Amino acid sequence: MGYKNSDNTNNKFSRKSMSPSLTGGKGRKTVGKKVKKTIPRKTVNWSSYDVNSDSNEDSDEESENENDSDNDDEDDDETEHHHLDGLYSLMGKRPHDSSSNGDDDDDDDDDNDNKNIFSSTSSDGDSDEAMFSSSDDDSDVDFVKLQAQQKAHALKIAKARKGLKSKPKNESNDNAIASSSESESNSESDNEDDDDDVVSLKKLKPRKKSFLKYGRRRSDAVLPDINFKFEFDTGENDELEAGNQETHIKEPEEEDIGEEVDYSPENPVDSNNVPSLEFEFDHHLIEVPKINEEELNSDEDYEIDDNELLATLQAENDAEEFLPPITKGNSQPQRNDSLISSTIEEEENDNDNEEASKGGDGDDDDDDDDDENDPFLKEEEKYLVNEFETNGFDENEEDEDEDDLHTFDSDFSTTNRIVNSFKGIGEDRSKPIVKYESSVSGGSDYDEDDYIDLINFDVPLFDDKNGHLDGGKKNSHHKGNTDKLKKDKVKQRANSNHNSDEDDDSYLWNYFFSSDNDSSSEETDDKNNSKTVNKSRKNKKNKKALTNNAITGADELFEQIENDNTFKSKSKSNHHGNSLYKAYSDSPMTIQDLEAEIRAGADDDDDDDDDYDSSESTDVDESLPKSSSNNSLVGSSKKATEVLSSKTADYRPPKLGSWVTVDCKPFGVIDGLSTRTLQLNKSQEPRSAAQSGTSHSTSIVNSSNGSGLGLPTTSIASSLAANPRKSIVVGPTNVPSSMISSDDSALGLDELLNVSELDNDDENDVKIWRDFNNNQNKKKIPLGAFRNKSVLYNNHIYQDDQHHHLHRRNSNADKKFNGSGHIKKQQPIRRQSQSKIERRRASIVEAVSQGYRPTKSGLFSETALADVEELLGDDRDLMELIQGL
């Protein structure tokens, strides 16, 4: 807008009305300063702000204001009014009420001019109340001056705000006022009072000053800066507006909210609403079906129909087989031909059943819950019955017809090609390695040789060249079987297609039946194995398909397995090196031939079967001659052998501590059960040679004070006199070293393990043991005979030991007291024994006088014993027992 220098008076109100548009709807307030009404030093060119007005009238009026320099105040006010409305509509906001701004100027202006100016400013001031916190930028605001203005004009603003109570509706409707048109702003300005006109007139002058003061610096600023001024000038009147808003905020809430929002947190909850909510709480719960007790207790759910059970199980098992897998594109799923034919039949049956079920749904709505009306079970039943009646598990003809109808586009994928290549291995050696089982016609568009590269087999077994390597013998045998294989393959391929890819693991048979593929010398066996695999694979597929040829196929399978085992046994005999395998597999041999073979292969056995042990028997066959290697190792045989003595009648239990080494027995005990052969020459034993120079104390193994169990001294002396080469292993300490033969070297471990059977001269033990082994007299000899003997023997050793220790104590006591006071321990023992005997005799005399008979078992009454003798007088054995007591 352009202004002339001579027209200060006419342009005064135009500048006042324009200033809110540049200062954000509020004039900048200064304290104690008045700006002279001079010519603005810089004009505002609105073309540089790139303002897009709502209508073309704003641009026309801007051009009129630039070119028009007349003194018509009304025209200037109207054009600026339209211009301000256009700016505010672009910003989406309204400036705050001009009456909220305090003023320091008391300029005298005409009332007509005030009314005209108020029309443009009162509409702007009415909507300025909605300018709360719409911007976040405070970089262009001088807060120090704002606080000074707020403190100085707080009282005047409070008086000037008395007219705002009549218009609370304008504050609540921010969006409506922000988008209001020019006519609405004019209608609002007409409703204002005369007092508001005076107040609005006073507010225009500080806008002019602030425009002159601050507008020079920001004349080139874009519209977003103006938005920031709109925002932060609202903070001046926060304190005053807070009290006014509290008074009239509830009025629009009562009108707007009213009946719709009764449960708002501002309104207290009525006591009548609480029981209503509790009453309706049960209705909002999830509806749980109520089941009668009769239905729970009934046994109908547990009654299972066999036909329905079979149909359900068949449906569950065949769900994955009959349903085609999800494939990408238009390619059909890779399935066997029988499966695809069955799925086509099933889909046809499903469509028929669905149409029938749709037609009958209207009549059978009440019976849908019953198992009889289950459409899925009906479909399965119908399908199974039709299949059993028509096909009877035999789908050979249908599968052969359908092989030409179905093509497998998905077979070109890498995984499927590899899997199918495994299936074709070894079926027919005259054809390529990879061939799809479902394509009987053989008319495939792809090159089958490409699949050979995918499978890295090191075996030259399946090449066609191998058929010409071994001469006419192999070729004639091969030709005889290829014709048979071709016939079987055509018949059995359709049945094998019934199995899914997951169940068909027949390609793994090649690994189990061709274990000797690495050696090139066994190609004959490999070919036989491959033929066996071909037949066994087909027989296995026949079993799975449950065809009529299953029984004959099983017989062929077992026959081929037996033939294959014979081939394997021969192949093992070639590279094992042991003639035993060949001997048992080829032909029966005589014992002489077998011995000759064993002698010839003794060296090979040492190399190959050195660590071999059958672990099935502990006996050695003595009919076979011993090898030279075994003859050199007599005492270190690796096999444990058990040798039993023939003298079972004279066997006696060995006594502990009486083990004596002997030279007459070549066997020693290892663990009480098994025995091993000892060396005949003791000088070869390294232990005995190393210990030959040791003293005789090593011959006494257990000689601590003679406390261990050992032979009596008499038996030891007699045994040493009888056999001077015997050495005592366990014995008392008083055996002199001269009794041990000096020519006998130290005992070896083998000698300590020898068992002495009949060396003991105690004839009593021999007699007792023989009587014990005798079945006739076994009952009469109790086991206490051995126990009593051992007790008496141990008693004798214990008494000797006590006497020995007593003698040592007495000798020590003599040395200690030097003969002054001799302590005799035997006298009180004799006195105690004499006193016991005397008391016993006195008690016996007293018992006899009272009528009792003393026996070994105690005192018995004479009358009782007399009654027993009268009653049992005829039984002599019992009487002897009683009298012996």
Swiss-Prot record:
Biased composition (Low complexity): 173-184, 626-638
Domain of life where this protein originates: Eukaryota
DNA-binding recorded as keyword: no
One BP term from GO: regulation of transcription by RNA polymerase II
Biased composition (Acidic residues): 55-78, 102-112, 125-138, 185-198, 252-263, 294-308, 344-354, 362-374, 392-404, 603-622
Spans annotated as Disordered: 1-138, 150-201, 234-275, 291-410, 465-639, 680-708, 813-835
Pfam families recorded: CRF1 (PF10380)
Chain intervals with Basic residues compositional bias: 26-40, 153-167, 534-544
Cellular component GO terms, alphabetical: nucleus
Location of this chain's protein in the cell: Nucleus
Bias kind Polar residues: ranges: 1-22, 115-124, 328-343, 689-708
GO molecular function: transcription cis-regulatory region binding; transcription coregulator activity
Induction: Induced during biofilm formation.
Biased composition annotated in UniProt, kind: Basic and acidic residues: 375-384
UniProt KW keywords: Nucleus, Transcription, Transcription regulation
InterPro entries: TF_CRF1/IFH1
PANTHER family, per database record: PROTEIN IFH1-RELATED
Binding partners and assembly: Interacts with FLH1 and TBF1.
Membership in a protein family: Belongs to the IFH1 family.
Function in brief: Transcriptional coactivator that together with FHL1 regulates the expression of rRNA and ribosomal protein genes. The FHL1-IFH1 complex is targeted to the ribosomal protein genes by the DNA-binding factor TBF1.
Name of this chain's protein: Transcriptional regulator IFH1
